[in-house]
């Protein structure tokens, strides 16, 4: 790790999307020599290895409640000793989950969790907004806020410490009032980057020519979601749901493009379909020139940034009661075809 005096920026990333955004926003010197990265389990370890100044937080969801509590308290107590630069460095972060304890009560700038994430999650009627309001009024919520600060409960920038939002498109939400909002469309970020910078970003994601050839081999892409990893569906439920969707298409024309956090074994369950499971978000592939004639998805927000001349078959979270309870009902803010299971 670099001398702490050289660390002027902190980037807390829970998704490949937010990491991509940070890489566009800063130059290579800042990224390589003056940023310490904290990666959550949503980041692939092989990608994380490409960053010299980095700390990786493993998935804690399968640990006992006591073990998770011990880890949280340990991080709360030791963070400024282990990472003294947290006291002074500018913080750019996704503020959900366990790593948000690193922010504490410091000001920070929010990175995007994905396209339109604030519009989707931080408006009246959204599952997350309702959960935050309910939790804040409980004794447990008040204790958590006292120990860790408000951010652990009021994430997605819904707190007084989040001063800036870095978005890739215009979002709408009452929590944006009074905040500094930067809107940097991905295509503009890509176009404004030099060829060397574009190659640099692709190299961080371990993308090579043979990967591009695989992706270009099929005209239709199924965009997966990490619903088993998020413990929303069982393996059997995931298989049955995806099988019911894919039977509507010619399997020889499809490639399954997995979500970066999706570890479901599509090769095992769908042996006749090409699978691309490198942990790369579709938005970056689109910027690099990968184009499909059609995308199929349940409710992946990855399709929000896809060019309008690409067809979207959108099934929606309402095709499964567990997914609907988690995601809520929403639709793309672009042309799409609403699909139904037969």
Named regions from a protein language model:
Residues 214-230:
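Conserved donor-binding/catalytic core segment of Leloir-type glycosyltransferases
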Residues 7-157, 303-304:
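Active-site and donor-binding regions of nucleotide-sugar-utilizing enzymes
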Residues 249-278:
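Catalytic donor nucleotide-activated moiety binding site of glycosyltransferases and closely related
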Residues 63-78, 229-237, 326-329:
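Short, flexible/disordered intra-domain loops and linkers
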Residues 32-36, 47-63, 115-120, 134-143, ...:
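Active-site regions of enzymes building and remodeling cell-envelope glycoconjugates
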Residues 10-15, 38-41, 101-105, 122-123, ...:
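Short His-Asn-centered micro-motif
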Residues 110, 282-327:
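A donor-sugar binding/catalytic signature common to diverse glycosyltransferases
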Residues 136-218:
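A nucleotide-sugar donor-handling region in carbohydrate enzymes
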């Amino acid at each position: 790790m670099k001398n702490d005096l050289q660390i002027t920026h902190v980037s807390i990333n829970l998704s490949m999307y937010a990491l991509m955004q940070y890489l566009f926003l800063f130059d290579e010197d800042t990224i390589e020599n003056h940023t310490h990265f904290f990666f959550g389990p949503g980041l692939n370890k092989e990608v994380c290895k490409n960053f010299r100044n980095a700390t990786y937080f493993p998935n804690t969801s399968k640990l006992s409640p006591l073990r998770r509590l011990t880890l949280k308290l340990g991080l709360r107590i030791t963070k400024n000793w282990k990472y003294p630069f947290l006291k002074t460095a500018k913080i750019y972060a996704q503020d959900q989950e366990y790593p948000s304890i690193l922010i504490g009560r410091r000001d920070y700038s929010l990175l995007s969790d994905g396209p339109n994430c604030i519009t989707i999650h931080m408006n009246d009627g959204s599952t997350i907004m309702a959960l935050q309001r309910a939790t804040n009024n409980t004794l447990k919520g008040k204790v958590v806020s006292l120990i860790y600060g408000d951010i652990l409960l009021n994430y997605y920038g819904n707190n007084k410490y989040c001063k800036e939002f870095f978005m890739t498109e215009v979002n709408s939400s009452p929590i944006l009032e009074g905040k500094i909002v930067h809107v940097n469309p991905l295509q503009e970020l890509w176009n404004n980057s030099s060829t060397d910078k574009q190659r640099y970003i692709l190299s961080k994601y371990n993308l090579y020519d043979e990967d591009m050839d695989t992706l270009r081999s099929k005209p239709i892409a199924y965009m997966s979601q990490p619903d088993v990893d998020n413990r929303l569906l069982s393996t059997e439920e995931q298989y049955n749901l995806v099988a019911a969707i894919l039977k509507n298409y010619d399997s020889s024309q499809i490639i399954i493009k997995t979500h970066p956090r999706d570890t479901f074994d599509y090769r095992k369950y769908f042996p006749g379909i090409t699978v691309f499971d490198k942990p790369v978000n579709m938005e970056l592939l689109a910027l690099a020139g990968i184009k499909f004639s059609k995308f199929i998805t349940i409710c992946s927000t990855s399709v929000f940034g896809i060019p309008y001349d690409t067809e979207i078959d959108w099934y929606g979270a309402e095709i499964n009661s567990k997914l609907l309870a988690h995601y809520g009902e929403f639709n793309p803010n672009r042309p799409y075809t609403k699909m139904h299971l037969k």
